């Protein structure tokens, strides 16, 4: 042990452990576990339509512990298009049922409301559905703020969040960012 450092396992709150052909997919055991992360939280890689497939192919086969912030969109980040391209793909009841069936593996609900994700839809309309989903499932939201274009005040977004909700994508330079200039 004199030439090695012993550390507890790290927890990474925002990763994309998923099949490599999925939008942001990366191999968690190869890229996270090998660097000391023993527990990771997927940010919306799966939604209610593909949760069972994801659980069998990724979670059950990985050495690393993986927990999901289930995407508010039915297919999560499986396909290479904006996650909220179709407003109809946000099925509150289906998502709540999926969460109720796997409450230990699904720790929250993922909603990235950047322009790249919301497509032509108003982020406020998507957030309304996400909040209803979170209330009905009693789960926190992993929230990706909308900060470019700056068409929705950060303070107005934060006012919608509840205790235990988590904000991601906040360490950047610019409006709403926490990074020093």
Where are these regions (language model features)?
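Glycine- and other small-residue-rich loops at beta-strand/loop junctions that grip anionic moieties
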Residues: 20, 42-44, 84-87, 119, ...
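Conserved mixed alpha/beta catalytic, RNA-binding, or beta-rich assembly cores of soluble enzyme
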Residues: 14, 46-47, 172-175
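Divalent-metal coordination cores built from histidine and acidic residues
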Residues: 29-115
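Active-site gating loops and adjacent loop-to-helix segments of metal-dependent hydrolytic enzymes
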Residues: 2, 8-9, 34-38, 70-88, ...
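Short secondary-structure boundary/capping elements
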Residues: 20-24, 90-94, 122, 149, ...
């Amino acid at each position: 042990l004199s030439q090695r450092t012993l550390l507890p396992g790290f927890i990474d709150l925002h990763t994309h452990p998923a099949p490599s052909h999925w939008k942001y997919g990366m191999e968690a055991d190869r890229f996270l576990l090998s660097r000391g992360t023993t527990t990771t939280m997927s940010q919306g890689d799966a939604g209610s339509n593909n949760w069972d497939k994801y659980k069998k192919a990724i979670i059950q086969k990985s050495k690393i512990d993986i927990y999901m912030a289930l995407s508010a969109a039915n297919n999560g980040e499986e396909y290479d298009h904006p996650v909220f391209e179709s407003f109809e793909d946000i099925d509150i009841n289906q998502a709540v049922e999926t969460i109720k069936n796997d409450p230990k593996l699904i720790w929250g609900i993922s909603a990235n409301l950047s322009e790249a994700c919301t497509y032509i839809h108003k982020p406020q309309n998507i957030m309304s559905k996400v909040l209803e989903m979170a209330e009905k499932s009693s789960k926190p939201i992993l929230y990706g703020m909308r900060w470019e274009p700056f068409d929705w005040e950060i303070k107005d977004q934060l006012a919608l969040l509840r205790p235990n909700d988590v904000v991601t994508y906040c360490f950047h330079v610019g409006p709403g960012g926490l990074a020093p200039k």
